Amino acid sequence: MCWVAVDRAIRLAEKRSFPYDWDYWRTTRSKIFKDVYYNFWDEELQSFIQYKGSTTLDASSLLMPLVRFISPHDPRWRKTLKAIEKELVTETLVYRYNNEKSDDGIEGDEGTFSMCSFWYVECLCRGGQLEKARLYFEKMLGYANHLGLYAEEIGLRGEQLGNFPQAFTHLGLISAAYTLNRELEQAKKL
C-alpha cells in the first residue's frame, strides 16, 4: 500500500499540475516496487508472500494487479495466482491466509473472506480467464442473503460470519462486476 500511496500521489500531482519533487517521488516509488518485487517473493513457493521473510501466502496479494502494482500477465503474478488457487481457494471462496501456517492471534478458525473472493474474480478477469471469472462471480452471488447483502466471511456451510453487512465486500462485488462486464463487452467486439 505504500507503493500505491506514492503512485497515486504522483498521478494526482501530474493530473492537477501540483508541484512535487519529481525525482524523489519517482525514486521512492521505484525503491518500494523493487523491495516488494524481490524481497517479498519466495522462490520455493513461487509466490509473493505475506511479509518479508515469511513462507505464508496471503490473499491480500490479489490486490497487486488490481492497484496496477504488477501486470496480471507478469510471470511472478501468474505463479502467485496459481499458488493462491492451490492453497487458499476452495470452490469459489478464498481464505485470507492459511490459519495453520500463520498465527494471527485470533483463536479458532476463520471463514473465507468474501472481499478476497471478489478480488479473485477480478484477477481472473484481468488475466483473461473470463469464463472462469463469470462462473465464480455467479457462484459468489449465491452467497448473498435475501437482500443481496454479504458478511465479512462465509463459513464452510455457506453461513454468513463476521461483520454484517460489510461495506468492503460490497466494494469488491461492485469492482468485480464492473471489471467482468467491461472485459466481457470487449471480448464481444473481438
For the regions a language model picked out, list residue spans one by one.
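Inter-helical turn/loop segments and adjacent helix faces that build the functional surface
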Residues: A9-R26
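Extended glycan-interaction surfaces of carbohydrate-active proteins
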Residues: S30-F113, L135-P165, L171-E185, K189-L190
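C-terminal substrate/ligand-recognition segments
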Residues: D109-Q129, H170
